[in-house]
Regions:
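Outer-membrane beta-barrel translocator/receptor signature
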Residues: 210-211, 227-229, 240-319, 325-329, ...
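Membrane-embedded beta-barrel scaffold of Gram-negative outer-membrane proteins
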Residues: 386-390, 394-400, 404-410, 579, ...
Length: 812
């Protein structure tokens, strides 16, 4: 086979990037080279690659126009380095002697000659169209880093895994991440927990979005994934780039990007309980030069549930424009719109008997009123600018504006229920409404430099956010009857209610600012040292208005220049394995609790120690992680023991601890077989509890299973059956229990739930290169179990019975 130009291009369109710093030598692609090439326009990156490797690079300018490289840092052969550099670009490469040829995958630029090495660009940051369960790098720490380089545990849900396991919302994601559980209602707004603590640190494209119960105004938990191509979950304290929050971890949602090539995809689904969903996603260049690109994706879902009366409608639209202002500057702007209308979606779950035994409810039981509703709407606008300052330095500016509205009527049925005659339950209801908005801005620079002869990386930045929330509470019709006790919980039909007059309005504002920095130094060849710190300013104000008597109750809390550090060591044992140790902190403001003198309680403080071992194999397509961790949370609010009970006074005297072990493997283990498996062992305890010393030494997070195993594997059959895929997975966990958190807690009655094992499966078939048909089956053996366990009074939920989802995916 000989070199030949495609008919589409003439010889004069070929560009030649040659080695300038190193002499040309035969078989240069086999020699190890220490590369340092930042993310930048691909033409510039290929020039730097040629200079650093001594390899000639041939390409057509039209083939790489509008494309950007990924970051390449480390020691690789020229072949390995070029593969990593071309990740996400959609181009092929080939070597012949000391020359590398670049072409579009369609082959319309060059007919490649016979070569000594032929390869395809491997995994990068973007996981779309990689068909991989892992990623080459993540961005949850501001810069692109492989999982092996990060001294904390990070789990990634890639685009392919989201498709294979039929995941459509962020709340669905929580059920797949090892060691993560959720608490909350069945309307999709469940709060995730990891390692015994709440995860209330959220990011979008690496930009902090205060969204948790302790620091945020809006909620992201119910978000549709139509806007995002992957989800990154970091476990442990994450205060360095985030600011205030709990020590459970952080979640980074990464938006889909626009391609310069026209692509159209659709997803059509139909499943159990009248579950129907449609997606349409279109993208492509908007000018001939492909410097302006756009993408528009939309989804609509309507469904019922396995319990009586529950149903919902959800709609989402995502749009983004990307513009190459010049070879060094990329601008992005867009929006995400989402709304959900939920009806009778069981916001408070099921109760148990007061002696801790289970009530024999049918799985279809719904104790919510038929008039219950929960309607939410969210609109977000975003802008991002990335500028390559030079070969080593890059600046990023990102800003978001979000509006979030809620209109709801909730009812709850629970109480101290007698196991003899089923009496003792009550029914309660109220209306709610919220109007919230939030601004977030982040500006940072990151780059590489030499320090004492060693290559180093620094990140310096600042971010700020402003949020306002106006939350109203409403009475309902037959309000006095709402607290009537129910004579028999097993023969009870919830009444209908209607929202009436407003009785309370709470206005909250939250301002956060932060300065942060991180330095990573390669002290000597196998060892990287990472040090970082963040100074945070936090200002929370609340004004609660009693609409009945006009009385205002105001409170505020400020934290000034609160500093949290981060320290980490990463030691490369060999090209495949690295070991690490890290220490991270975070703080959590304690809102609406005061000391006896009226001053705000000092923030809670969380610190996490972690020691681990990470592996990367098969050119980064398989990643492993083993970690032991300990998180201590101090300064929890406790009622002041030196003051009378009539004084609503607190001291920061509580202390809890969580510790354990995690193991995870994700990626391709053999041709056609992608899998993920994660095991978590986690215990927690009260270390200090002045209000109830009986609790000390007992379990703190009782609803977190001590043992949890989550697995999933998908196999693309080989040979003549290669159009078929089969998948299977499981969720296996030990028992949990719920108990009261007030009163005589140490002697409280437990609501215990045993462990369970749930198995799922998938079968897929490629009709042709454009169409795939599949069916997903959840809970194959139709196991009856509780997916969430509350106290004896409420908040226990059955898990989904066996159900199926049929899917047709098209790609053009």
């Amino acid at each position: 086979m000989s070199h030949a130009l495609s008919k589409h291009f003439s010889l004069t369109t070929l560009s030649l990037a040659m080695a300038m710093a190193l002499p040309l030598v035969a078989h240069a692609q086999e020699q190890a080279v220490n590369f340092n090439i930042p993310e930048q326009p691909l033409a510039n990156a290929l020039q730097a690659f040629g200079q650093q490797s001594g390899v000639q690079v041939l390409y057509s300018p039209n083939d790489i126009q509008g494309l950007h490289s990924t970051r390449l840092n480390g020691t690789f052969s020229a072949q390995e380095g070029l593969a990593k550099l071309l990740q996400e670009t959609g181009v092929n490469y080939s070597f012949q002697g000391n020359a590398a040829s670049i072409s579009r995958k369609s082959g319309d630029a060059l007919e490649l000659a016979a070569t000594s090495v032929v390869g395809q660009a491997g995994l990068g940051v973007n996981t779309e169209n990689t068909r991989s369960y892992t990623t080459g790098a993540v961005t949850i720490g501001k810069s692109e880093r492989s999982l092996k380089e990060i001294p904390q545990t990070v789990t990634v849900l890639t685009a392919q895994r989201i498709k294979d396991q039929n995941i459509t919302t962020l709340n669905d994601v929580y059920g797949l991440v090892p060691g993560v559980v959720t608490y909350g209602a069945l309307n999709g707004d469940n709060q995730p927990y990891a390692r015994g603590f709440e995860i209330d640190n959220f990011q979008i494209n690496g930009i902090p979005i205060p969204a948790g119960t302790s620091t945020g105004i809006t909620s992201l938990n119910w978000s549709d994934l139509i806007s995002y191509e992957r989800v990154e979950v970091l476990k442990g304290s994450a205060g360095l780039f985030q600011g205030a929050g709990s020590p459970g971890g952080a979640i980074n949602l990464v938006r889909k990007r626009a391609s310069g090539d026209f692509k159209l995809s659709t997803v059509t689904q139909a499943g159990t309980w009248d579950n129907y969903r449609q997606e349409v996603d279109v993208q492509g260049a908007l000018n001939e030069e492909k410097t302006l690109r756009g993408r528009l994706a939309t989804s609509y879902n309507t469904r019922s549930y396995f319990y009586d009366g529950g149903k919902s409608k959800r709609a989402s639209t995502y749009g983004v424009l990307e513009f190459d202002l010049n070879p060094d500057t990329l601008l992005s702007a867009g929006f995400t719109y989402q709304n959900a209308d939920n009806r009778s979606t069981m916001d408070w779950g099921l109760p148990g008997y007061k002696d801790g035994s289970k009530i024999d409810f049918k799985r279809s039981t719904n104790l919510s009123s038929p008039s219950d509703y929960n309607d939410v709407e969210s609109t977000q606008y975003f802008f991002e600018a990335k500028h390559q300052l030079n070969e080593d330095w890059k600046a990023t500016l990102a800003t978001n504006y979000t509006r979030f509205n809620l209109d709801a009527l909730y009812s709850n049925t629970g109480g101290q229920i007698d196991p003899i005659d089923n009496s003792g339950a009550y029914n309660w209801a109220e209306g709610r409404g919220e109007n919230n908005y939030q601004y977030n801005t982040d500006l940072f620079v990151n780059g590489n430099f030499d320090m004492l002869g060693r290559r180093s990386e620094v990140i310096l930045g600042a971010n700020l956010s402003h949020s306002k929330r106006v939350a109203a509470r409403y009475e309902v019709t037959d309000y006095n009857r709402a607290y009537d006790f129910i004579p028999d919980i097993l023969n009870f039909t919830p009444p209908k209610y209607a929202r009436t007059k407003k009785y309370r309005t709470t206005t909250s504002t939250l301002d956060q600012q932060g300065l942060y920095g991180s330095l990573r130094v390669n002290v000597f060849e196998p060892l990287d040292v990472i040090v970082g710190a963040r100074a945070s300013w936090f200002d929370y104000k609340q004004d609660q208005l009693n609409e009945t008597n006009g009385r205002h109750t105001k409170s505020d809390m400020q934290t000034n220049a609160k500093v949290v550090p981060f320290y980490g060591l990463v030691y490369a044992l060999n090209p495949n394995w690295s070991t690490y140790v890290s220490y991270a902190e975070i703080f959590t403001p304690q809102l609406n609790v005061e000391t006896v003198d009226g001053s705000a309680l000092t923030p809670r403080s969380g610190d996490t120690y972690e020691l681990g071992l990470k592996g990367e194999f098969y050119d980064g397509t398989l990643n492993t992680n083993f970690a032991i961790f300990r998180t201590t949370y101090t300064g929890l609010a406790q009622r002041d023991p030196n003051q009378p009970t009539t004084c609503n006074c607190y001291v920061a005297g509580g202390k809890v601890r969580s510790q354990g072990f995690e193991a995870e493997i994700t990626g391709r283990v053999m041709p056609g077989l992608d899998l993920t498996a994660g095991y978590t062992y986690n215990t927690s305890e009260y270390v200090n509890n002045p209000n109830n010393p009986d609790l000390e030494g007992t379990t703190f997070q009782t609803s977190m299973p001590e043992h949890m195993l989550r697995t999933w594997a998908n196999y693309q059959l080989q040979g003549e059956y290669s159009k078929w895929q089969i998948g299977a997975g499981s969720t296996i966990q030990s028992g949990v229990y719920g108990r009261h958190v007030g009163g005589n807690v140490g002697k409280g009655i437990k609501n215990e739930t045993g462990g369970y094992a749930i198995y799922n499966a998938r079968i897929g078939y490629d009709v042709n290169k454009n169409v795939n048909l599949s069916v997903n089956i959840e809970n194959i053996f139709d196991r009856t179990y509780y997916s969430q366990t509350g106290t004896i009074e409420s908040n226990s939920y059955y898990g989904n019975p066996r159900n199926m989802m049929f899917t047709m995916r098209t790609n053009f």
